[in-house]
Amino acid sequence: AIGADAYERLRASDGEAVSQHSRAAFPGYLLIASFLPIIMWNGVRSWPTAIGMFALAMLMAVAAWDLTRRPHKSVGYMVGYAIGNALLIAIISRFSGPLLVVPAVFAFVTGSVVTYPTFVTRKWLLMGIMLAGFLAPIALEELGVLARTWTMTDAGVLTFGDGMELSGTPTVVTVIFASLATIVMAGLQSARVSSASRAAHHRLVLQAHQLRQLGGHVVRVQQRHREA
């Protein structure tokens, strides 16, 4: 068991980690919301899907900002946050199919959200939520509940989307931009996690060094007392 003071210090450390992490995630949701004009440039096939993506991205941005200000949330809140992420990416799959950019986005978001303290000890819960978000649209398409966004042909995988038109230069630009955005956001988030881990490791090394110095000083003082 640890004392109350140590517990509060650990809790504060977790809160700081959540704040930093959600602050890094905030621009990503705004970036997703900014795709609405790009979707309109391609040609909207489903306004409810387009508006739903924009609205949910903005809602997730608000949730991320709230986490930066009040990081100590319940498990239920964080599960809702994870479900919101999975649902947002599932909606994104309606624009270009689930096999083009979406798997990379799911991998990036899962790797990002799992670093929250709530999911460090509940990784399988998070992975279950994310896998459900990836597989649900595919299953619903197979059942005929949702319009198909892809099919397999002799030439390979044919993606045609349901939320926007997929043809011509706008679509090429959109796919490239979405891929670049995913790579950049993943790189920035990984750099943030690595930087935080490196800083924590350095603090431990310095503290261990200081303790060794203190221990050596105590030993020398004790030896002087014995010699005296």
Please place each PLM-identified region on the residue numbering:
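Short, Lys/Arg-rich, polar N-terminal cytosolic tail immediately upstream
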Residues: 1-16
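Membrane-interfacial helical/loop segments at transmembrane boundaries in membrane proteins
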Residues: 145-167
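PAS/LOV and related PAS-like sensory modules
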Residues: 212-228
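Membrane-interfacial segments
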Residues: 47, 71-72, 144, 148, ...
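Extracellular-loop-to-transmembrane junctions of the mid-late helices
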Residues: 21-28, 163-189
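Hydrophobic transmembrane alpha-helices and their membrane-interface boundaries in multi-pass
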Residues: 21-113, 127-139
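C-terminal TM-helix exit segments that contain a strictly Trp-centered aromatic cap at the helix terminus
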Residues: 135-149
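Juxtamembrane or sensor-core-proximal signal-transducing alpha helices
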Residues: 1-5, 62-67, 173-212
